[in-house]
């Protein structure tokens, strides 16, 4: 199995899990020990305003009227930030040359200053897999994988990310429908 770090996982209709159905996951780590990713197309009820007001900082323009994404059902008490450029942070891992995952508070403070981080997605919680678990789910056709695209990740509204990720594979959502109609 290829390393799926810096890929999107796209849920197929065979994945009937109520949380992950219809999800696009940005894979932040995939190795022999397991995998970690963030759902990037399902909003939480938490407004970005609340994140910045919690640290007494103004909300940057790019985050006004935005919601924190529901990154996954694991560690839902923890925040995760996927951002570009990478930069130097207290708790961060590089995903590729331009994108990193950071879990330390210092990035939120710098996001408020609007001077270091160009683009970012904030999530609560994450998705994680034990060693071999993701590979089994891929064999069961629960997920489609495609190299990630920064435009889809950072620039598209969350509700357009599923369709756009599928389009990278030349697939329209209707092509994945479980049951065809009868004429």
Q: Which residue ranges define each predicted feature?
A:
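A short aromatic-anchored loop/beta-hairpin motif
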Residues: 1-123, 127-183
